[in-house]
Swiss-Prot record:
Organism: Shewanella piezotolerans (strain WP3 / JCM 13877)
Keyword field contains Nucleotide-binding: no
Function: The glycine cleavage system catalyzes the degradation of glycine.
Name of this protein: Aminomethyltransferase
One GO location term (cellular component): cytosol
Length: 364
């Protein structure tokens, strides 16, 4: 029996096409994935992300614990509400999950973990917390709605009350604030501005309806995937997992190597991988017709004239750009051209940094 979010009936009211997503009944689309994609790039769309898990980490050792648990360093967070993105690694340097951590105070943090990895994440966190003066509390009574797009903030402002609008005024990206019953964060998974709003389940349907009434278009998992891929954002389970280290997943920027005495989980393994040289995650664009898909092979010739091979981790047709884009894990000797094998033929592709669209415009 699949889990249902508190917004399940709202999805049905909007003719959501429901599919199983890691054990959750979630909307794939509400009629047109392409229209939903364009709504987020050009106006405002919203996603039910209540299947994600909110976890509060509270206690005297909260900072010390998270400095061990995460490859990024929460000690960098000094301003209440500031957030950072990073990997939770195993002892081999593999990515257990990628998550956002909000600093609320020196003794209180909030992390948001992926639905697909929830049980594994919580088991790992509860194992690692032993010996620390910390309470780890899952918050299943909280739902989450992401409102994204160039007009998302303006439309949300008509829904928020005066207290909430005052709280978010001038808020920079990657911050979160509790305002009355809502935790409102300037984060997202689309490459557009907007909010991710954590809301008590009892209020979630009314908030969803208020956003609908404000002209925010409901969007499903299909558009969520094309938007995040255009933005060059990883999807756990495709672009990385426990068999992949962050250096090979375009997450090297999220590893805080300094100070050298911070012994975060996976550090020793990761230092060895770094010294030996890791694969890298690149972006690919293809002018030819067709769509690059997960699992296809990528070939290129390195500077020594030796053929090298990599693998497509995510691929799609980009509605914004009008051609196929992909992310691929490849040996780090790759240049700026390669070939993808499609239907037993090799098709030329251009190699770029894995970021295709930001704020509605081509990013390369």
């Amino acid at each position: 029996m699949a889990n249902k979010t508190v917004l399940f009936n709202k999805h049905l009211e909007s003719n959501g096409k429901m599919v199983d997503f890691h054990g959750w009944d979630m909307p794939l689309n509400y009629g047109s994935q392409i229209e939903e994609h364009h709504a987020v790039r050009q106006d405002a769309g919203m996603f039910d992300v209540s299947h994600m898990t909110v976890v509060d980490v509270i206690g005297d050792d909260a900072c010390a614990f998270l400095r061990k648990l995460l490859a990024n360093d929460v000690a960098k967070l000094k301003v209440p509400g500031k957030a950072l993105y990073g990997g939770m690694l195993d002892h081999n340097g593999g990515v257990i999950d990628d998550l956002i951590t909000y600093y609320l105070s020196d003794t209180q943090y909030r992390i948001v973990v992926n639905s697909a990895t929830r049980e594994k994440d919580l088991a790992w966190i509860n194992e690692q917390v032993k010996g620390f003066s910390v309470e780890v509390t899952e918050r299943p009574e909280l739902a989450m709605i992401a409102v994204q797009g160039p007009n998302a903030k303006a439309k949300a402002a008509t829904v928020f009350n005066d207290t909430q609008n005052a709280a978010v005024e001038g808020m920079k990206p990657f911050f979160g604030v509790q305002a009355d019953s809502l935790f409102i964060a300037t984060t997202g998974y689309t490459g557009e501005t907007g909010y991710e709003v954590i809301v008590p389940e009892a209020e979630a349907e009314a908030l969803w309806q208020a956003f609908l009434d404000a002209g925010v278009k409901p969007c499903g998992l299909g558009a969520r995937d094309t938007l995040r891929l255009e933005a060059g954002m990883n999807l756990y389970g495709l672009d990385m997992d426990e068999s992949v280290n962050p250096l090979a997943a375009n997450m090297g920027w999220t590893v805080a190597w300094a100070p050298e005495d911070r012994d975060f989980n996976g550090r020793k393994a990761l230092e060895k991988i770094k010294a030996e040289g890791a694969d890298k995650l690149v972006g690919l664009i293809m002018d030819a017709k067709g769509v690059i898909r997960h699992g296809m092979s990528v070939f290129f010739t390195d500077s020594d004239g030796v053929e090298q091979q990599g693998t497509i981790t995510s691929g799609t047709f980009s509605p914004t750009l009008g051609y196929s884009i992909a992310m691929a894990r490849v040996p780090n000797t790759i240049g700026d051209v390669a070939e993808v094998e499609m239907r037993k033929k090799r098709v030329p592709v251009k190699v770029i940094a894995p970021s295709f669209v930001r704020n509605g415009k081509q990013a390369f």
